[in-house]
A protein has these predicted regions:
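Conserved PLP-enzyme active-site core in the AAT-like
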Residues: 3-262
Length: 262
């Protein structure tokens, strides 16, 4: 029996466990864990960002981004079926004290005309719209991929309208590898988070990416919500191993198509 409930039910391979056992560790609260430091720098460079922050989950990464990009009372534009709005236990209203505004979309890809209409409707009786959050791949649309060129267009729009763009990229490596697209997301969004424990196969962990200033502030927010960790290189080593073997996702895609076709 193959368990296909979720890509989160995977267990570490023997090779991954060996990396965990032999990981070099230190106190990450003091930025002294070499494995974490290496992972953060490597991942940031890989996706074109200035810096990264290792966090326990994608939810934590998303919520720290909102804490960074918004002020209490702001609105964040996203899709009505997004993970950040529907599947994070109301964390955005609890932590950031913001609300969401929804726009039309096709498979997670925002309708720019509707987005523009919503932005231009804003006036002093309405909440300030500060951030746009998209999800790539889009879970509620069956894991659909937002074309990279559409993210570029969206970022041009958000930048010209003084809005921040956050990408919930929990499974973004599916999109990057499947379409063999550019991975320089750092040029086309203000922040991005992705999970090592989804698809990539690590047991724990996600990473939040952005500018150095953004990540410095995010480190403080992580501490405030109890996300600071100590000898976390033990799990960061598994994340690095998973990321170095990301090409295996293409085999997963072939197997998924075979199951679907049969």
């Amino acid at each position: 029996m193959i368990d296909i409930r979720s890509d989160t039910v995977t267990k570490p391979s023997k090779e991954m466990l060996e990396h965990i056992i032999t990981a070099e560790v230190g106190d990450d609260e003091y930025k002294e864990d070499p494995t974490v430091n290496e992972l953060e720098e490597f991942t940031a460079n890989l996706l074109g960002f200035e810096a990264g922050l290792f966090v326990s989950s994608g939810l934590m990464g998303n919520q720290i981004s909102l804490l960074n990009h918004t002020n209490p009372g702001d609105e964040v534009i996203t899709t009505s079926d997004s993970h950040i709005q529907n599947y994070e236990h109301g964390a955005a209203s609890f932590l950031s004290r913001i609300q969401f505004r929804n726009v039309q979309h096709k498979d997670g890809n925002l309708d720019l005309e509707d987005l523009d209409t919503q932005i231009k409707k804003s006036f002093y009786h309405k909440p300030n719209i500060s951030t746009v959050a998209i999800e790539n791949t889009h879970l509620s649309s069956g894991g659909s991929i937002i074309p990279f060129e559409d993210i570029q267009k969206l970022y041009e729009y958000t930048s010209s309208n003084n809005l921040k763009l956050h990408v919930d990229g929990a499974r973004v490596w599916h999109a990057i590898l499947e379409n063999d697209t550019k991975s320089n997301y750092g040029e086309y969004c203000d922040s991005l988070t992705f999970c090592f424990s989804k698809g990539l196969g690590a047991p724990i962990g996600s990473i939040l990416l952005g500018t150095k200033s953004f990540i410095n502030d995010s480190r403080e927010y992580r501490k405030k919500i109890g996300g600071g960790m100590r000898q976390v290189g033990i799990i960061a080593s598994a994340a690095k191993f998973a990321l170095n073997n990301r090409e295996n996702l293409l085999d997963d895609h072939k197997k998924a198509r075979k199951i679907y076709d049969e």
